[in-house]
Amino acid sequence: MSGTNYRTLAIVGSQWGDEGKGKITDYFAQQADLIVRWAGGDNAGHTIVIKRNKYKLSIVPSGAFNKKSMNVIGMVVVVNLRKLSYGNWVIYKQHGFDLLKNLRISDRVHLIFPYHMKIDELQEEYRQKDSIGTTKKGIGPCYQDKAERIGIRLGDLFDEKGFLQKLENNLKFKNEVLQKFLIVKDLTKINLKRIFWHYFQQIKSLVTDTSILVDNAIHNHQKFYLKEAQGVMLDLDHGTYPFVTSSNPTASSIPVGVGIAPRYINNVLGIVKAYNTRVGTGPFPSEIFGEVETYIREAGHEYGTVSGRARWIGWFDGILMKHSRELVVILVWLIMLLDVLTTIKELKICVGYEYQGQQIDYVPSTIKEYEMCKPILITMPGWDEDISNVTTFEGLPHNAQQYLMKLEEIVGVPISLFSVGPDREQTILMNKEIF
């Protein structure tokens, strides 16, 4: 890479989410002036470990644990105000972090209401065996209201009369829908106004036009870091539809979600695990079964931060990563949880798919085709040495080095960082010119 000192760094989950974006955001936040989350909602969780203390977050950007940086919730994020209330700030206050000073929220974010969560739950029950595995946080129905132009944005609460009118209009229809599904308890305008007004007063001073904040940061040559939730394979358009999220967590959506021109994005990092996981429903060609599956799940603590659900476990999928590389235009990538693979005697890597007797090297666009794909695997020797205290690539066991080099060869993108444990200090940066 050139000697450019990158000012704008975007990180994109390149699998099915849960790749470790929270940890990496916290890591780079130590150098950033601004951290911006541009999409998703509180359906995605992030776990950060600092000096062996574990913190689980959902809506506040992971950079909140850096007192020097400003954290921004961008305009395409959907927000449950209760998750931003004072009661959820205890974790930060206990460690000396004041969100009133280092958090700002776009006045354009759409709000999640109780009726969104109820409808989300009902839709999942109605689908039965065809459930898509939603977290039932109301994310999809909120984005649906946005697309139908009946959504309520955070900035609407500054106009009490206008807010109440929009809420009343929505409740007329939402209550009718809920009653038809035998949920007879009405969601009333008065009750919702009281709840939302209470939460709004707590965060009112944080609400602003964040696109101006970001624009000023760019022109003042500040370093800022862009982060999404979920991953490329959960993208509404490019993922395994319909088993996807309701937003676009690929780098191409950054300009819309943040409010900047594409030319300001200097570098895009793809983040992946040294193996593969997914949660919910949908095709997963490289899935592992048996003892190795159980070992990786327990060693990697592979349970959803928000849902608590056990994640599916799979071998590293090179075809999926090439798909992500092309969609996101990944310049460098980061390998997380390499330590989890320690003591596994044979490691496998998916290098192709078998589909109807033919070998293919791409991700099919339809679920039916993708579900019929079988992995074509190569085998590499594992390692037994503890790598949790390694601080350089050269300090890794020979087989671990060979494994990383093979992944780099398959994907065709240089690895710039790898992780050997959950703590911030267990992050090894191989290319110091990233940021």
Swiss-Prot record:
Q: Got a GO cellular component term for this one?
A: cytoplasm
Cross-referenced CDD domains: AdSS
Please give the PROSITE patterns that the UniProt record associates with this protein. ADENYLOSUCCIN_SYN_1, ADENYLOSUCCIN_SYN_2
Question: Would the keyword Manganese turn up in this protein's UniProt record?
Answer: no
* Pathway annotation: Purine metabolism; AMP biosynthesis via de novo pathway; AMP from IMP: step 1/2
Binding residues for Mg(2+): D18, G45
GO MF annotation, one: GTP binding
Cleaved signal peptide residues: none
Tell me what reaction this enzyme catalyses: IMP + L-aspartate + GTP = N(6)-(1,2-dicarboxyethyl)-AMP + GDP + phosphate + 2 H(+)
In UniProt terms, what function does this protein have? Answer: Plays an important role in the de novo pathway of purine nucleotide biosynthesis. Catalyzes the first committed step in the biosynthesis of AMP from IMP.
Task: Give the matching PANTHER family.
Answer: ADENYLOSUCCINATE SYNTHETASE (PTHR11846:SF0)
Q: What is this protein called?
A: Adenylosuccinate synthetase
What is the primary gene name for this protein? purA
